Amino acid sequence: MLKRISVQQLTLGMHLKEFCGSWMEHPFWRTGFVLTNPKDLEAVMASSIKEVWIDSDKGLDVAAGAPAVSEAESEAQVEAELKQVSDGQRQIAPIPAALELQRAAKICLHGKQAVVSMFEEARMGKAVDGGGARLLVEEISDSVSRNPGALISLARLKTADDYTYMHSVAVCAMMVALAKQLGLDEAQTRSAGLAGLLHDLGKAVMPAEVLNKPGKLTDAEFAIIKSHPVEGHKMLMVGVNVDPMVLDVCLHHHEKVDGSGYPKGLKGDEISLYAKMGAVCDVYDAITSNRPYKSGWDPAESLRKMAEWTNGHFDPKIFQAFVKSMGIYPVGSLVRLTSGRIGVVIEQTAKSLTTPCVKVFFSTKSNMRIVPQVIDLSRTDGTEKIAGREDPAKWRFSDLNELWSGLPKAPW
């Protein structure tokens, strides 16, 4: 039986199923093993992780009566939290996703090339081309205004090799969407986008063999990676009239509200609004993307994981606004409908976060592919609903991304 417990309850002999936190910030590159080495237990205790999942069927259990949350209880808590932000009208996108996707693909390609150039300039000690960066943010912001789901979802289709560059584009787009959801003015929204674009500039000077290492990082290597906010801040300071918001997000996007983040261990209101926004956007893109050491999670699953971590990692109000901007089932999420059909979310609708447009293509009743059909769940009068999310790894649909994007592969 899976149980979520505090790391303080963790003992040798327990089967460590999963960490309650982003995999970039715990001391292991794998999970799903029995803790037998005292040094491994010490490493978990010394990390910023506060809770873990254990499997009591494969290892020791917590003591009778000890506090623990079952998988069903945790899921109910998360769904209840997401339900709180699901009601209410959404602003409908002016342009359908299908029409914006082609234009967004070109912006992603241009964006990746621009970020590559920025990183190369930074490595040589040159100031970032602020004018070029602002023009790119303007392009991305305009695309998000036309249809936020298009570019944000496309930018997720990065490979492990181009992750660092496309991650900057993706976080920029999500920062813009989140700023709009929070009601920030146009100037603040563009600044938030610029901060997202440049937040990881410090990775330009991280050793490639460490940045792209497919296995567990040593303590020394992890310390190197954790230096990238400070290094990026130094690089940005080379420029003239750099927006303070950009500097702030670059330096503090790995801070957590409980004080367990880095580089300064800030907590609560010590962290600015914009750095809190950056933290949410950064983690979401990281855990939904394929990395050298791990495949990305499904978008809907990722939001639910982040909801589990909200109390320690994120500002709850910022996270709720992020969910509103993305949808409870973001574009690209694999879902099962009450009819037994499986489909992929292709667009959000204005009515509710729980009634997106879904392209169904598989029947669980016949266990066969069916002719793809787009269903707007906001117009079914409740006769068809999302019954739950599905694990893409279980079904292994090789064309899942093509089904929602219309593109056979990422064009960058």
Where would I find each of the regions flagged by the language model?
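Histidine- and acidic-residue-rich, metal-dependent catalytic cores
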Residues: A98-W412
